Amino acid sequence: MDSRMDQYEVMEQIGRGAFGAAILVNHKTEKKKYVLKKIRLARQTERCRKSAHQEMALIARLQHPYIVEFKEAWVEKGCYVCIVTGYCEGGDMAELMKKANGTYFPEEKLLKWFAQLALAVDYLHSNFVLHRDLKCSNIFLTKDQDIRLGDFGLAKTLKADDLTSSVVGTPNYMCPELLADIPYGFKSDIWSLGCCMYEMAAHRPAFKAFDMAGLISKINRSSIGPLPPCYSPSMKSLIKSMLRKSPEHRPTASEILKSPYLQPYVNQYRPFADISHPIHSLEKPITSSRSSQKSMSGSQCSSISGSDIDSIQSSERNTSGPSTSSNNTIDTEGAEATDHVSVKNCSRSDDVKSNKETVGPELERQDSSKSIHVDQRPRNEIKQPKIIKKILTTLREESKLRQNNSPIRASRVKLNSPSNREQLSDDSKHSSDISSSSKSSEVTSRESAKVICEPVKRAQASPPLKHLSPIVEHSPKAKIKQDEPLQPDPAKQAMEDVDAAVGKVKNRTPPSYSRRLSIPPRRPLGAESPLHADTKRAHNKVIKERAKSPCRPVHGPDNDIIEPPGFPMAPPSPLGGVQMKVGNARAKSAPPRAVSIKEDSSDCSSSTIAYAENTELSEPSKQDSSAQLVSSCKCSIPDAAIQKHDLTAMPSSELNTTNFQKSMASNDDVCENLALEPSSDISEQVSIFKDNVPCSKISQSTANAIVQNDEDKFTVQELLSSVADIAPFVSTKNFALEKGSPPIQSLERTSSPHLNPPIEDVIHVIRHSSFRVCGEQAVAENAEMGVQSSDVGKLLNVVREEVDSRSIPSNNLVPHRLPDCAAPKPNISETNTISSKTACSDVVKFLTVPEVNSTTTAINNGFKEEASPTKEILDVKSFRQRAEALEGLLELSADLLQHNRLEELAVVLKPFGKDKVSPRETAIWLAKSFKGMMNDEASRSSM
């Protein structure tokens, strides 16, 4: 028997997607071009096969002047589904907009397209077909610039007023109710149509953001930019009416056609559409298609959910079950099906590429087990918005998907984005086990059983993504669903949020370094941390202590309450406070307002140092109001290292630089006392270098560090070398600490004669137990204790991001070693009893971990410093700074390549790409941080 393919002459491949290839063919007898969509069933999952059959059946039933023409469909050799559709010479709308190169379309042309699209959508909805993937790249054009709506791979047949809950489509075109995981109906197509019309008018997407959180926020607020002024207010209001947040407030397709403004164009093009083509039964078109489907294996036709069967039977009594399946889930299981990219009927080179939008991939999550009506839902099935995690997970997995597929891409990706592979295999097995005549209750019970069994493997979630959960207005039916408990399953939500957060971090930070800088999610109360067992007990102790006094302020050594007014109290977190014991001192917890994000460091090595990347500095509204600088550092230290020096610190102790109260001097000047605390063998020093800040007069009673009143951003640089080698990487001036009395040497600065010498804002926060200031005895003790260790001087430099180290080379001062003025001492009492009349006459403020203890005669040393030139503010729009950052990244990449450090090179280059989000700040941060690490390692290897 001759194959139907013999009737066609293959010309070229014009697209490739998840199912297979889109091939331009020429009918040998008709001498007419068509598009052949060839789907290889053997490489697809059951759901993909069903979706292919569904598209073949659905498009065969649709016949409308403004919908892509259907020619024929058949199954080739039992393993290929072939769908032949009309060829659109004009390409698609997305390509046409690119060719326009910023030139807006005339309003008449837009209204013509609008009328044709509205007629096509009204035809679909009147026949209970929900397209679910309306976007500009699925709107094709003939050579006469007429509309042809295509790509029905995600279309679904609904009852008259029914809703569906499967999350499908392209994120930029998704409606608020779909993102909120609320059942949606035909109004979701109206929203997508509004997005298309906005994009066709403005030549930019209606909703666009750098990340999924921003996109969801804009969609939930229906926040769109202004349309070009060249269009009439009537057209603008019509487009905006389709983008209303509440589905009830959006017009239907028939109401759009009745709009007085659009009426002339509707009347002009309706005669062609008025030939009222009803949906044909599947018995009429392509009888060979019917016969070939009968020969297909039972597994290919057995995965129709009961709810879809009910929907099909109620709307079309004369059609067969397998052919009318409306279950559209696309599965990503298997290497062959990893890149589910929809094939357009008419695709161009621009469309074959990945979507340029940062949130271009499309996601699909099937809730076939969920019945639409509330009374059919089991009580133990908890429904919650999960689309955010799905989208973020898919964005993270997109890079993996590219590696297993052809370099040619279509413009969207449909992913099931499962939480684990086991669930995927279970879904496939269940879908093949359910016969086409099974009831929806059976499917629902199976799915709910999985929901119950699954969460026990998950950990408690983190809250960073909870603010992303959209809150939308919805229809009465949706409101009934919302009345049900929406509390997320804590164990299930945990892994989703953690995975999403970690996925975002992977694009920005180098996971291959043992010393890594990352922003992990903050765990809520009660979350288990992967630390020692005794650390967990200590955590529990602190948690109980906080539960008793959740809002207890930090007390200084003189019982002064350090509690900046006007700051809201955040909920306490087990990682939010200081959990360190020094001597026999009681471990005090920091106030719950310490909200810096921290990382759970594993107990693998003392070199695993994590620091909060975003150290927040809250800016006061008034000059005399107090603010706080919250920064946190946490390091995992082996027990042996702690016991070696008789330090009674916890095995994985945390350091939280507690709230420094900010106050202002009389003449709007700011000064800052110096906080010093030397460390022993394994010492991490956190140095916050700030620009010089003039001060007019320092009050003798000032007991708190005063921080510069600026919107400061900090970037972490981790330097693992001796302190004397830090100079090239310090972008602001540092105090030199030398031997003798006074231990802190003065630095001269030329200043106005009427001003007192200003003090450089330097805060040294050094880890571990208590210390004692003494003169020569301290030097002798340090000579005995661990100075010879190569690990001394491990330094975390928290440097101003705004300051470019290359622009101030003259001010890089070499910080000397610290053992001259301090030595470790296990007795904590000495740190709290330093007299201002001591022989050293030194002014050193000590920071015992939960407390801030300082003396009041810091001005007696007469600090002076040199004048520094005007600092350079970080400007992401500065081409010079961006060029320097790029140059630094290129040098780093070349160096890594030269040393064959390919894994680290991959980490450096991972955040960049035409389909990746790489803010300019990230590029500059990477250029500085990684280059600093490389230079530091080179200096250590040369020693």
UniProtKB/Swiss-Prot annotation:
Protein kinase domain boundaries: 8-262
Biased composition (Basic and acidic residues): 337-356, 362-384, 423-432, 474-484
Biased composition (Polar residues): 402-422
Keyword Kinase: yes
Feature: compositional bias, Low complexity: 288-329, 510-520
Active site: D133 (proton acceptor)
Name of the protein described by the UniProt record: Serine/threonine-protein kinase Nek5
Superkingdom of origin organism: Eukaryota
Keywords: ATP-binding, Kinase, Nucleotide-binding, Serine/threonine-protein kinase, Transferase
Gene this chain is encoded by: NEK5
InterPro entries assigned to the protein according to its UniProt record, in alphabetical order: Kinase-like_dom_sf, NEK_Ser/Thr_kinase, Prot_kinase_dom, Protein_kinase_ATP_BS, Ser/Thr_kinase_AS
Species of provenance: Oryza sativa subsp. japonica (Rice)
A Gene Ontology BP annotation from the UniProt entry: microtubule-based process
Lineage summary: Eukaryota, Viridiplantae, Streptophyta, Embryophyta, Tracheophyta
Catalysed transformations (reactions): L-seryl-[protein] + ATP = O-phospho-L-seryl-[protein] + ADP + H(+); L-threonyl-[protein] + ATP = O-phospho-L-threonyl-[protein] + ADP + H(+)
